[in-house]
Amino acid sequence: MIYLSVPYSGMEELSFEVSCLMAAFLMKTGATVLSPIIQGHVLASKYDMPCDHEFWLKHDLEMLKKCDEMYVIALPGWEKSVGVQREIEEAGRLGIPIVFLEAAGLIPKGD
């Protein structure tokens, strides 16, 4: 299973859209994908869930433990994203391979 890591804070709608595009693409190729952005974005926006970083990071890191590899989508600012960096650190600690993907072609025109 692939854990999809994407920076989120400050560009929530873009991150959600890019996560959906990449998850759909990967799933069409037969991959099983876990996207905490897709799950968390919908839950937080529709069901009055907490929006604080620590709440979601705790859940995200638990989900990461179940995955075989992690894909990081290199949206602008990914290197400074506290969440992405913590996920990279945890994946490294767990021995989970990390693949970095360029965001070119994933960002909708006008953003």
Where are the predicted features?
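Conserved catalytic or regulatory cores that recognize and/or transform ribose-phosphate-containing ligands
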Residues: 1-111
